[in-house]
Structures are given as C-alpha cells and as structure tokens.
Amino acid sequence: MNFEQTHRDALTEVLRWRRDVRHFRPDPIDEAVIDRLRAVMDMAPSVGNARPWRVIRVDSPALRAEVLANFNAARAAAGSAYAGEQAEAYATLKLQGIDQAPLQLAVFTHRDPAAGHGLGRASMPVTLQQSTAMAIHTLWLAARAENLGLGMVSVLDPKAVERLLNAPPDWDFVAWLCIGVPEFTDDTPLLHRAGWQENLPTEWERR
C-alpha cells in the first residue's frame, strides 16, 4: 500500500497533539474503544516478533490508592535532588493522573519470553525493553487518534508495583499508563509551557 499526503498530514497531526497527559475528565471509556486500543498495541514491532510486553488492567480503587501512595513517596524522594527555585518548580508539577484517569494499565516486559526463540536479543537483551517501549508508543498514538489522552507515570518504585500486582517473577515493571479524555488538549508539552524543559531539536550527526 502506498500512502498519500493526507495520510502523512494526519499522522503528523496525531504526533503533534500527542501529550503526556496528567489532567483527565472522569468520563468512562467504552469497552469497544479499549478493545481497539488493545488490538492496535499488538501491531507494534518487537524483536524476533517476541511481543514481550505484558499488561495488567487495574480497576481496583484499593490497588490504585496503593499505587498513588507509592507515587507520593517516590516523588518526595526524587524531590530531594532539587534545591531553591528548581525545588519550588518541581513541587508545582503534576506528574500523575492516577487520581483521575478512568483506565489504568500496568505494563511489564517479560524478561525471557518463549516467543521469538531468542532471535535478535542474544547480544542485545535490551531490545526486549525497547520492544515494550515501542508498544507503549503505538498505544499512545492510537489513544490520541481516539481523542483520548495517555500519561505515563514513571515516578514509582518498580519492585513495589510488581509485588502489589503479584506479577510473575520474570516480569519487569516498565510503566503505569493513565488513559482517559483529557481536560484540555495542547500541541506543546506541559513541561515546556511550565518552563521546566523546553522542546529542543535533536541534531543528527554524520560520520
């Protein structure tokens, strides 16, 4: 299949308006939409076609509350690395949507999946984590195309999350994903607008 300019324009718009969302409306997400997101995530590339990502959908308010407590502790610990005005700025940043998002997913990487038969990862096992990252990004774009927002929470103690969710011992926690209708949309990252870190172009070096 060959694509045309309308396809390129649509993809660029989805990419431009994809944000790491922290502010969500409580509107529930239709199960048919969630099924579409799951199907698109499975279209992501992976090393050896191993599809090492594993996903737990967390609906329990009690589990979410424990993850939020985990976040609050990890955030406080991370905040000790900052001082002065930077510490004050850090305290104002909203770094999670656990308290609002209607759909929440814990994503893991299987450390040694049988699928793929080890192809492509013997010399670079990190490709399993890279595959999971690509699956998350694929889901992110699919969510945005559904007029949803996705926020990835990384300020967490991963081992505590693994214990809390009773994850198998060969699953490594990667990210907590919050998904829902965003309170607002923006074509500029929140951290750029907040003055924490502006968007900068990446130069491609040549050899």
UniProtKB/Swiss-Prot annotation:
It catalyses: FMNH2 + O2 = dialurate + 5,6-dimethylbenzimidazole + D-erythrose 4-phosphate + H(+). Keywords: Cobalamin biosynthesis, Flavoprotein, FMN, NAD, NADP, Nucleotide-binding, Oxidoreductase. One of its GO terms (molecular function) is oxidoreductase activity, acting on paired donors, with incorporation or reduction of molecular oxygen. This is 5,6-dimethylbenzimidazole synthase. Homooctamer. FMN binds at R18, R19, D20, V21, R22, S46, L95, S154. GO terms for biological process: cobalamin biosynthetic process. Transmembrane segments: none annotated. Involved in the biosynthesis of cobalamin (vitamin B12). Catalyzes the oxidative fragmentation and contraction of the isoalloxazine heterocycle and the cleavage of the ribityl tail of FMNH(2) to form 5,6-dimethylbenzimidazole (DMB) and D-erythrose 4-phosphate (E4P). NAD(P)H is only required initially to reduce FMN and oxygen drives the oxidative fragmentation. Belongs to the BluB family. InterPro entries: BluB (IPR012825), Nitroreductase (IPR029479), Nitroreductase-like (IPR000415), Nitroreductase/BluB (IPR050627). It is an enzyme of class 1 (oxidoreductase). The keyword Ion transport does not apply. Its EC number is 1.13.11.79.
